């Protein structure tokens, strides 16, 4: 089973970096500006992000299929058209437990002071 690792970081001193390293179905950066990073993440059945957190808050919108979001608040099943919000540094895992392909738009606001 492959896993994807999500990492979005803001670096103090006014520089911002965003990085998504994926093994498996993959991802595509849809928008990467100085203020926001949007990525379309594709998860094959059984694939997940692995437990991770992002420095800024994270918004996810399920575009296709179904995923399970696990966080300290519990487990939540999200179907296409549903969204989630996680405050910065919240540990979480996004997993495709279905037998269909799942696609999620992941949005992180960059903070460069």
Q: Model-flagged regions — what are they?
A:
Residues 1-8:
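Bacterial N-terminal signal peptides that target proteins for export
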Residues 8-18:
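Bacterial N-terminal signal peptides
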Residues 23-50, 107-110:
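A short glycine-rich, His/Asp/Glu-containing loop-to-beta-strand
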Residues 55-72:
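Glycine- and acidic-residue-biased ligand/ion/polar-headgroup-sensing regions
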